[in-house]
Amino acid sequence: MIELRANPDIIRARLAARDLAKAAGLGVMDQTRFATAISELGRNAVQYATGGSCVLQDLSDARQVRLQAVVQDQGPGIADLEQAMQDGFSTAGSLGAGLPGTRRLSDRFDIRSSHSGTCVTIEIIRNKRL
């Protein structure tokens, strides 16, 4: 588990995601996709919730590479998830591309939010060449 409290933690999570993807045999493009998604989620946790945690797992089997990341925080939650998932929506004056972009970078994307925090689970899945 990687604690997310400040910018250096986001960098550490991004590098760990890239290293996990590389060790799993993913190409540079997929390594970058996974690392970028983790960076976006980590930044949200630090910026909007004053921190959280990131757990990276390799759930691969004989048929496919399957990498999972779970990023959680204990912030105030997201008031309107549907709106937050729209490109361009932001409560902080940013571009509003983080969550929608992360969804596009991921093969699986799940977000749950309440007044006690937000949890985002993403996966990158690739079939192995047999």
For the regions a language model picked out, list residue spans one by one:
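Conserved beta-strand-loop-beta-strand hairpin that lines the nucleotide-binding pocket
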Residues: 1, 42-130
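Bergerat-fold GHKL ATPase/HATPase_c domain
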Residues: 1-36
